Amino acid sequence: MDTNTLHKPPIHFNQMTWFDRFIVFCGVGFGSGLAPKAPGTFGSAFALLFVPLWLYLGLSASIVVIVLMSLIGIYICGHTAKVINVHDDGRIVWDEFAGQSITLLPLLYLQQMNWLWVIVGFILFRIFDVWKPFPISWADQKVSGGLGIMLDDIIAGLWAALCILIFHFYLLT
């Protein structure tokens, strides 16, 4: 995925149906993915605005919402890629919303949702999302459509979440 959106074809919202406009607006992270440089980082940072929601919902309800967000994201990301005619365009950041949210789930479980841990989670997720160790790289290269767009970020979120658990249990206790 290209991190520079300056040379991508423009997204013409005014030429879309209201439904396509709504789905693409969600797909580009309510506009956060339209940043000219590093849209994935901006989308991941925007996802941190969900932290109060996860705190309010608690662990069980947050898991349900994040699973639904991920399942709906398969359609949103796939449809957005089809409408703008670019597969896994860097401006599509709904997948970052899901991956970043998955990363933060251990903080709810551990009751450690504070800004230091949230920033650690943000950094870990971005490292895995950019670095793409196996099986993230496999999902990124071999799985197509909306599932492919979502899957690499879901796996990156799981890797980052695992790192948070390891840091907490083996380094801090």
Predicted features and spans:
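Hydrophobic alpha-helical transmembrane segments
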Residues: 41-45, 60-67, 93, 115, ...
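Membrane interface segments of multi-pass transport proteins and intramembrane proteases
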Residues: 53-67, 85, 137-146, 172
